[in-house]
């Protein structure tokens, strides 16, 4: 971890609180996965096998994606620098990609449908995200917003400060959001609906909400100018889920208008968000005013996606 991250000593070993939260999150994820697998009567040993695959793949993909996309890392880019993963510098989207790859491999080994295995990992990964976000409070830069200028934010449990300014604790919002999404998606998973629906629903909801949280974050993590690169990756996530739901509905109708509507919604959302991001970063307009249409824009693909999902699943 970085030098400014908080740690404690266990003998002569430095234990970083952020790393400890990630480890606890991984343990919680395995426990949640094991319980879900038991409820859905998955093959014995599914959770341990997935854990063995997901942990190294998650770390590797997280590190590689960060090294490829972080502007600050490019100045020291080398294989040796990439391998120093314990010094900090990871991408949450990369970790999720590694976890998804592990689910596909585990499904092949266990001879179960890949989409079902991908569904099973969703609550577990959301639990991991919650722990990881809470751990960001023990770093100096991660998980906080731009400096707050409004007097409304002078006090409150969502506000933290230093000698320079006050900041919004975005890590709290992200952790709560992950837990809420896990609670919302778990009943559908346990009911045993259509394979892949839980994954796609998670991609849609997590993608839309994380675009908002990445906009609020201002920690220079994987940023280019006024845009967070992880925000773009989360946008691809919700766009992909929306298009899959639209294609399903189009096949059921035997007509292509849902796909064209989905593409229009994606274009409108992307254009609107980029414009609002520019104004948030460069203009003096109140952020309260700017984030109202921001939330409405991100709600549009989520609503469309779930309408398509519901209608495509009708008998």
Annotated model-derived regions:
Residues 1-315:
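A feature for loop-to-transmembrane-helix boundaries and adjacent hydrophobic helices
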């Amino acid at each position: 971890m970085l030098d400014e991250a908080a740690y404690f000593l266990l003998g002569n070993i430095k234990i970083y609180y952020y790393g400890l939260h990630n480890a606890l999150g991984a343990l919680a994820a395995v426990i949640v996965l094991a319980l879900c697998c038991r409820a859905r009567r998955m093959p014995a040993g599914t959770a341990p096998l997935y854990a063995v695959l997901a942990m190294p793949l998650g770390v590797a993909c997280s590190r590689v994606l960060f090294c490829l996309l972080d502007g600050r890392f490019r100045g020291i880019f080398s294989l040796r620098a990439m391998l120093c993963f314990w010094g900090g510098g990871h991408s949450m989207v990369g970790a999720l990609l590694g976890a998804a790859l592990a689910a596909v491999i585990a499904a092949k080994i266990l001879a179960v449908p890949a989409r079902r295995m991908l569904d099973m990992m969703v609550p577990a990964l959301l639990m991991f995200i919650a722990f990881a976000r809470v751990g960001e409070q023990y770093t100096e830069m991660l998980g906080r917003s731009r400096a707050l200028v409004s007097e409304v934010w002078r006090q409150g449990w969502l506000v933290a400060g230093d000698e320079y300014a006050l900041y919004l604790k975005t890590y709290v919002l992200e952790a709560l959001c992950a837990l809420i999404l896990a609670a919302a998606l778990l009943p559908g998973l346990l009911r045993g609906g259509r394979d892949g629906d839980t994954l796609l629903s998670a991609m849609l909801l997590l993608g839309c909400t994380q675009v908002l949280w990445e906009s609020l974050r201002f920690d220079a993590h994987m940023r280019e100018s006024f845009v967070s690169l992880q925000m773009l990756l989360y946008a691809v996530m919700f766009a992909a889920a929306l298009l899959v739901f639209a294609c399903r509905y189009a096949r059921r109708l035997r007509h292509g208008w849902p796909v064209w509507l989905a593409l229009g919604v994606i274009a409108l959302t992307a254009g609107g968000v980029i414009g609002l991001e520019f104004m948030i970063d460069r203009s003096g307009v109140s952020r309260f005013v700017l984030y109202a249409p921001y939330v409405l824009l991100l709600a549009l693909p989520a609503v469309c996606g779930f309408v398509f999902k519901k209608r495509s699943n009708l008998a």
